[in-house]
């Protein structure tokens, strides 16, 4: 993949973020997601790839665009797998909370795991813990290993986990051991990435979340020299069979980084919609301008770019009427 592709991809996440940001705090997650999806799909036409969506908005009969198997890009350029989440954290945007972002990962053809839409158990951590932890260990053992490797007391560890009822038993274990817990209302990809950013102050990300989001997070962590280990959690026979149909012969086995994103190059881009652990959100400025804050990374070179971009909104012709609502509001 050419290095110029990284900047092409981040322009796509920027537009999706700008499209969804006007819906922040309006209680309408479907409109926010729809705006991001429409903008992302339109912008993909200008990207120099022959891409196939392997993680997207659902199956062909479930989503009008960015569905699994859809071809995207200008169809001139390298053949690649594409994983997208136009709006990671739809509920976050609807409620005006933190950590929503627009996300894309691109890898060579056949690299990305076709993750089924089900829960996945996850253990994510930064470079200092790579190769030292196993998702198969009891949580108490994992925390002790992490503390030893980081030269900390167990009670000084900070663990991030989604605030969900299904995590009640796991939270009890974390409380018993005595670690600090930072609950995340939503935003599974951002949560799994957080341990790789020292400024976030997170040592581990644990618990279960969406399998497609796990692949996106693994792509990011490869660029950040972190690691994500995972296990699919099929809820019934139908979900188990779905895994097998998608080529995962043993759905319960541990999935490594190589299983999820392959051994080749990966490009990851994300643009903040609302402020988060490591990205700022969309900010509306005077004179019909807006500022976005993005990250774009490439595994091959380990280059990590944080990009602040000023946009003149009337020139964003691909944006929907939702943006016009925000623009008119900024003039009042």
Predicted regions and their residues:
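Short basic, glycine-rich beta-strand/loop surfaces that mediate nucleic-acid
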Residues: 72-73, 103-105, 201-205
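An extended, acidic
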Residues: 136-289, 293-298, 308
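Flexible glycine-/small-residue-enriched beta->alpha junction loops
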Residues: 107-134
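Short capping/connector residues at structural and topological boundaries
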Residues: 71, 97, 106, 128-130, ...
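A short local loop/turn or secondary-structure capping micro-motif enriched for an aromatic residue
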Residues: 101-102, 122, 313-316
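A short glycine/serine-rich beta->alpha loop
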Residues: 3-7, 27, 91, 130-132, ...
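DPxDG-like acidic metal-binding loop motif
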Residues: 77-88, 92-111
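N-terminal subdomain of lithium-sensitive/metallo-dependent phosphomonoesterases centered on the IMPase/IPPase/PAP
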Residues: 1-83, 144, 148, 189-190, ...
């Amino acid at each position: 993949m050419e290095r110029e592709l990284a900047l092409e991809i981040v322009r796509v996440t920027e537009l999706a973020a700008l499209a969804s940001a006007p819906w922040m705090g309006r209680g309408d997650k479907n409109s926010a997601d729809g705006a991001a999806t429409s903008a992302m799909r339109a912008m993909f036409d200008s990207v120099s790839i022959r891409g196939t969506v392997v993680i997207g908005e659902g199956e062909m009969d479930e989503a009008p665009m960015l569905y699994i198997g859809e071809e995207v890009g200008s169809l001139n350029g390298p053949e690649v797998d594409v994983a997208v989440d136009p709006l990671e954290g739809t509920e976050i945007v609807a409620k005006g909370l933190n950590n929503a972002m627009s996300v894309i990962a691109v890898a060579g053809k056949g690299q990305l795991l076709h993750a089924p839409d089900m829960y996945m158990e996850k253990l994510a951590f930064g470079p200092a813990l790579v190769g030292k932890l196993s998702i198969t260990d009891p949580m108490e053992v994992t925390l002790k290993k992490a503390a030893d490797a980081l030269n900390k007391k167990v009670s000084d560890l900070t663990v991030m986990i989604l605030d969900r009822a299904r995590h009640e038993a796991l939270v009890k274990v974390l409380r018993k051991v005595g670690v600090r817990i930072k609950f995340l209302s939503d935003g599974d990809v951002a949560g799994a990435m957080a341990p790789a950013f020292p400024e976030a102050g997170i040592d581990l990300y644990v618990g279960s979340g969406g399998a497609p989001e796990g692949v996106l997070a693994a792509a990011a962590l490869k660029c950040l020299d972190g690691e994500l280990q995972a296990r699919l959690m099929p809820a019934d026979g139908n979900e188990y069979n779905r895994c097998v149909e998608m080529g995962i012969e043993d759905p319960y086995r541990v999935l490594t980084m190589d299983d999820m994103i392959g051994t080749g190059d990966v490009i990851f881009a994300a643009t903040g919609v609302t402020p988060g652990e490591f990205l700022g959100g969309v900010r509306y400025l005077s004179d019909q301008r807006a500022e976005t804050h993005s990250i774009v990374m490439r595994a091959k070179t380990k280059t990590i770019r944080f990009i602040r971009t000023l946009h003149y909104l009337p020139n964003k012709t691909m944006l929907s009427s939702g943006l016009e609502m925000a623009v008119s509001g900024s003039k009042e």
